[in-house]
Amino acid sequence: LKTFRTFVAVHQGDYFRTLADYRRFMMKQGFQTATAPDDAFGAIWCAWGYGRSVQPQQVYDTLPTVKRLGFAWVTLDDGWQNNVGDWRLDPKKFPHGDADMKAMVDRIHQEGFKAQLWWSPLSAVPDSELLRDHPDYELLDRDGSARKVSWWNSYYLCPADRRVVEYHKALVRKILVDWGFDGLKLDGQDMNGVPACYNPAHHHAQPEDSVEALPDFFRAIYETAQAVKPGALVEFCPCGTAFSFFTMPHFNMSVASDPTSSFQVRSKAKTLKALMGDTIPFFGDHVELSDGGNDFASTVGVGGVVGTQFVLPSLVTKHGKSDLTPAREQDFEKWLRIYRDKMLSKGQYLGQLYDIGFDVPETHAIRKGQTMYYAFFAKRWKGQVELRGLEDRNYSVVDYVTGKSLGTVSGHGAHLPVEFDGHLLVEVRPQ
């Protein structure tokens, strides 16, 4: 009798311990994780708030505010390209082509930032020159029709075709070397899985070759990025859909990926930290996607990297939750200062201490050195909270958002009476 190699585990608490055990089990089978540079933990400003119609001048005019608030990365999102597939520069925005894009990256660098570029690999719009000149790149269905990506108006390219891989490797070199970007933001709900390919031009041994080749496709992108720019940031955002464990070795930043609530930010953080460990940064995505559009606490409290897509109201004609009003700017200043001071994104996330489904209030714990950090979340809470994971010693407890002392606790399983609305973030330091 021969079976597939199988992982079986008995749960203790929620899913965190089992997923972490699975990661360790896979590493013993030769599974390797990516490595992230130290600057990957810097806060991110993304130009997506300006939409696909973003203009270079809007980016330039926003940089002083981005710098004053303390962000480390500037991301140029969707809208720089002529179309999805050809990935040439929009001539209306970059009339001098590569020289204009390089000048933008140089300007971003001169202001002290790292530069990241949005890109959606493995898809192409129907009227792209790529598909006109290379229709044999397409991933085809059993009846010979092109497979459409459900969200984009695009067709799948086949990751098992060597020419498709080489085309994308050349794009990586252009983005990171010719234009000078420091990182990639890979985006698209099609990135975590592709259908079987029946394109006869690809000479597949079986239609499922495309499915099995997908992790190797992203390996090629990641390894090319690291070869041409060691330490390059490769963020992987599957647009609100699930991640594939087998692509995880091939990117060095995970993300909450278009969350629709703050709970999704926190639960995705717990899941991805279990599967990828603490050395790979988790980006909480743009704060505008969280509850109220301003819930930095959910990202900071779980050890995530903070980010935003804010716009300057004076630079847009349509206004919304991305507008950086004076009140929001004060809030941003406070949370960016907290993020930089604590840098919990570099701490050890202790997901095994609390059950996200049954422990009330919802609690997350991070150890950094000898200090413990706890994040409590509830619509409204008045009562005791348990501080798990402490040693048999005395600790001082402080609300690190307000700076207010909450007293002292002692020993294992310490309890603390608290009252809060929404969230409470505390630092527990040995005396």
Regions found by a protein language model. Give the residues of each.
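Active-site-proximal substrate-binding groove within the catalytic cores of carbohydrate-active enzymes
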Residues: 217-404, 415-417, 424
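C-terminal beta-strand-rich structural cap/linker in extracellular carbohydrate-active enzymes
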Residues: 407-431
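Aromatic- and carboxylate-enriched substrate-binding clefts and catalytic-loop regions
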Residues: 70-282
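Composition- and surface-driven signal marking solvent-exposed, interaction-prone regions
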Residues: 19-23, 59, 210, 386-390, ...
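Conserved structural scaffold segments of CAZyme catalytic domains across common CAZy folds
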Residues: 1-116, 122-125, 129-130, 137, ...
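Short, acidic/polar
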Residues: 53-68, 164-177, 292-296
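Short, surface-exposed loop and linker segments with low hydrophobicity and enrichment for Pro/Ser/Thr
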Residues: 37-40, 206, 210, 418-420
